[in-house]
């Protein structure tokens, strides 16, 4: 198996763990979304600053730098949508709804880069998209008829998936002009820019500061929304550079499987660490 395939599969595993910890921080610890998003952007901005101060890319067109920065901008809005839904819904429902991105990537990569997928690859893409549609279906609340109900709010995640797909295509377009480390670092600056503009308010900063001073809580967010995302993006950027972006995106469709499996395992082994409730219908979906 080629190394880029392993990297493409390792990425959703890393971010599945991140997702479950995010749910714990948001729902378990009750961290407000503005403070949470500030840390998400700020932590990546810190990593970016360290890398770029020590090794800034030279001889690169300004347009390429802007494109790398725009990757973070697009992904920032994707994350804002996802975190907002994650605070309200279970991870095993939110993450599949994000997996419409492979179909966008596959179609656009075919148009832009001339990439093509085999029938089996297209099957993998459609399974990912089908899972996202099922995740937007829920059972009527108590006192209702118990019918399956479509939740329009999940369309917000579909929009986020389109933005994520666009960012992956930009990554593919500039991979020959910048190193993997530089792309991920400049992406971090773009992420920080949006999060700071939208959420940098005195109350949010104070709440974040108080949270980071709590030794029992701070490590969760430092590792899960600091160290792990930076390394996760190194993995997927490397994979995009070495393999077809459409296939890399399709392999990222394994994330819902990892989230579901880790959630089920956590519910069994460490129920206090998992903030999700399984029902028979959701298990079937």
What is the predicted function of each stretch?
Residues 1-10, 103-162, 166, 172, ...:
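Juxtamembrane helix-loop boundary signature in multi-pass membrane transporters
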Residues 1-5, 53-64, 108-121, 173-180, ...:
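Helix-coil boundary and interhelical linker segments in multi-pass alpha-helical membrane proteins
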Residues 1-32, 77, 146-182, 189, ...:
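Glycine-/small-residue-enriched transmembrane alpha-helix faces in small-molecule transporters
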Residues 3-10, 39, 49-52, 57-81, ...:
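Loop-to-transmembrane-helix transition segments
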Residues 25, 36, 85, 111-113, ...:
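Hydrophobic/aromatic residues within transmembrane alpha-helices
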Residues 28-35, 81-97, 176-182, 234-257:
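Structural motif at transmembrane-helix junctions in multi-pass transporters
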Residues 43-47, 97-111, 123-126, 189-194, ...:
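Alpha-helical transmembrane segments of compact multi-pass small-molecule transporters, enriched
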């Amino acid at each position: 198996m080629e190394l880029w395939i392993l990297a493409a599969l390792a990425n959703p595993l890393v971010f599945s763990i991140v997702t479950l910890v995010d749910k714990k921080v948001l729902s378990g610890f009750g961290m407000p979304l503005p403070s949470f998003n500030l840390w998400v952007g700020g932590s990546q901005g810190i990593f970016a600053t360290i890398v770029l101060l020590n090794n800034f890319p030279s001889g690169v067109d300004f347009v390429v730098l802007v494109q790398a920065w725009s990757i973070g901008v697009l992904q920032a809005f994707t994350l804002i949508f996802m975190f907002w839904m994650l605070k309200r819904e279970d991870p095993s429902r939110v993450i599949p709804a994000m997996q419409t991105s492979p179909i966008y990537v596959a179609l656009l990569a075919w148009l832009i880069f001339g990439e093509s997928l085999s029938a089996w690859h297209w099957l993998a893409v459609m399974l990912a998209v089908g899972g996202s549609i099922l995740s937007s279906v829920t059972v009527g609340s108590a006192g209702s008829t118990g019918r399956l109900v479509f939740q329009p709010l999940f369309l917000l995640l579909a929009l986020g998936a389109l933005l994520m797909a666009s960012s992956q295509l930009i990554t593919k377009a500039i991979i020959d002009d910048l190193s993997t480390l530089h792309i991920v670092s400049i992406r971090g600056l773009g992420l920080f820019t949006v999060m700071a503009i939208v959420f940098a308010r005195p109350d949010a900063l104070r709440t974040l500061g108080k949270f980071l001073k709590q030794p029992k809580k701070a490590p969760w967010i430092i590792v899960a929304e600091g160290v792990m995302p930076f390394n996760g993006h190194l993995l997927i950027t490397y994979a995009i550079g070495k393999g077809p972006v459409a296939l890399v995106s399709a392999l990222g469709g394994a994330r819902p499987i990892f989230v579901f499996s880790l959630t089920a395992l956590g519910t069994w082994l460490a129920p206090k660490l998992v903030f999700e409730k399984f029902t028979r219908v959701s298990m079937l979906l």
